[in-house]
Amino acid sequence: MIWLELAIIQRALIGCVLTGFLTGLIGVFVVRMRLSSIGYSMSHGAFAGAALGVAISSNPLLTSFLFSAVTALLIGPVADKARLSQDTITSIAFPLNMSLAFIFLTLSPQVGLSSEVASVLWGSVISMSNKDILFMAILCTATPTLIGFFWKELFAIMFDRRLAEADGINTRPFVYFIIFLIGIVITLSLKLVGGLLIFALLFNTASTVLQFLQEMRKIIIVSPIVGAITCVSGLITSLAFDIPVGSCIVLVSTLIFAMSVLLSPKRKRREVKEPN
């Protein structure tokens, strides 16, 4: 196919593989540690930051990272210090970030739904730069290394946080670490998938793999692979039908998840156990 020879498409293809790898990996922790509401708030925090970057004609990646960091602080250490539940903080942070995002986009000097504004909302094939690819490649190397280094503690927390604490593990630093990691992954994936859709990719891939596998080590290995395949499939669909890449990636991931639920061995076992 001719479009595969274009440098823009090649960057997008590499970006899809790296994005799918990262979201598939971090998504396991989001699902298993029950951080779905936190991931949702983090994604919209990054979205608000990117919108601010567009409004002030600054680097959306930088402002997105700053907003993600602030949101992570509010959800993690600040919530604990104030003795507020994470659900309370995320319930406040989500509408606040969405409100700020649309205010910033309204104040944007660009006319109408420009390409930069559209990429913040829905993602864009042409928005990936060599610098973005480099950052994602570094994160793809650093993240599995850090997870492997702290695997014993993280596995215990994923299994049961209270039991991990009873076993003498200080769980808070590790939960904060995962929250900040979620923010970084979302920030770097924002250009490709878009701020309104990135959370679906975090949740769908891991949930799909969990329909078939139970051993955590296998899940950690398979989920990034499924994520990469999903993103590449979404990119190809986007190019074939000329529709936003982020929407296609999320649509493909949702269809794969729906199929996994129908074909899941867990579902079949439940049907066998149910009395007639």
What are these model-derived regions, one by one?
Residues 1-21, 271-275:
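Membrane-interfacial amphipathic/re-entrant helices at transmembrane-helix boundaries
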Residues 9-11, 90-148:
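Transmembrane helix-bundle core of multi-pass membrane transporters
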Residues 12-15, 60-66, 87-91, 137, ...:
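Loop-to-transmembrane alpha-helix initiation sites
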Residues 28-111, 209-221, 238-241, 265:
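Short loop segments and helix-boundary regions at transmembrane helix junctions
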Residues 45-55, 93-105, 123, 127, ...:
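Small-residue-rich segments of transmembrane alpha-helices in multi-pass membrane proteins
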Residues 129-205:
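Helix-loop-helix "hairpin" substructures at the membrane interface of multi-pass membrane proteins
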Residues 191-247:
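Transmembrane alpha-helical segments in multi-pass inner-membrane proteins
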Residues 243-276:
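Cytosolic-side transmembrane-helix boundaries in multi-pass membrane proteins
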